[in-house]
Amino acid sequence: MIGDSSLCLVAGDLFPLRFTGGAEVSVRLPWDHRWHTGLQFTWSHVDDQNFWGGASFDKDTKWYVMKDNLGTMKHTGFRNNPTGGGEVTFDEDLKWITAAGEHWMNEHRIHRIHSLDQNRFAAGRGLWAVDLTTEITNTRGSTIALGSPTTAGREHAGYTGWFWRGPRSWTGCSVTSSTGLSDEAEIMGTEAEWVAFSSEHDDYDGGGTVLVYSGTSTSADAEVPPIKWFTRTGIFAVASPSPAFDQEIHLPADGTLRLNHRFVFIEEVLEGQQLKAIAKEYRLG
């Protein structure tokens, strides 16, 4: 358990994260949201359970309420030993366990860290990428609704799924999407192939760009809405390519949801054609 058990849950996360030059690219246990940890895969609304952390948005009160509903994503083993070298892969199985101890879902999660190029832009100023590929299977025996605070009634709060929390120094950073939008409010809830955040660093000279690809969300067993973006920069920098931004996924018994996303961490402030060229080079698929 991480931190206060009333706020946090056990889940897989990647932390610490750094750019190739050493600057931080994430934060762990920030004072405003103790359950934010680097780059993590979680889910805010799983029927009445919360596999995200903190309070749950309540349909009746129309605000956040602390409940005894924090679930746990329990690592049960690696399918293969984690690899090293030029490409690092973590291939693991997890069980989603409710606050009452019920086993609701199985997950097969793969993190693949790749494309390290330490000197792409200058000595020590390079990039690297990480992919998430995951399959979530309903083991409960009845349909499970996978949603978000927006599906529960809060506008512009559809965060769920793979979630990045940037360092405090990135508050107020610039953001742009592949569709040409360049404001957090404009991008929030939209569909786009990618979103990019850029900022100067604290502690290190220069700046960087975090490039996030929406990827894919598919299921042969349920209707799946398009991935939409949850983005913020004003109070802090966050990004989530949300599979259930404003529409629930009703995953039937034994049904499986498949997700695939990518982050690229770039030790250079990119914009315009340079950003588009990198986005094309490292696109998914």
Language-model segments: which ranges?
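Acidic (Asp/Glu-rich), glycine- and aromatic
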Residues: 2-18, 123-174, 274
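Extended, loop-rich substrate-binding clefts of extracytoplasmic carbohydrate-active enzymes
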Residues: 31, 35-126
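A short, structured loop/turn motif at beta-sheet edges
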Residues: 78-87, 123-126, 201-206, 217-221, ...
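Beta-strand secondary-structure signal
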Residues: 89-93, 131-133, 163, 258-262
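Active-site/ligand-binding surface loops and adjacent short beta/alpha elements
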Residues: 141-220
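Beta-strand elements of well-folded, non-transmembrane domains
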Residues: 94-98, 111-120, 136-140, 166-170, ...
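Beta-strand-rich recognition/accessory modules
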Residues: 210-285
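Beta-strand-rich N-terminal accessory domains
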Residues: 1-40, 147, 266-270, 276, ...
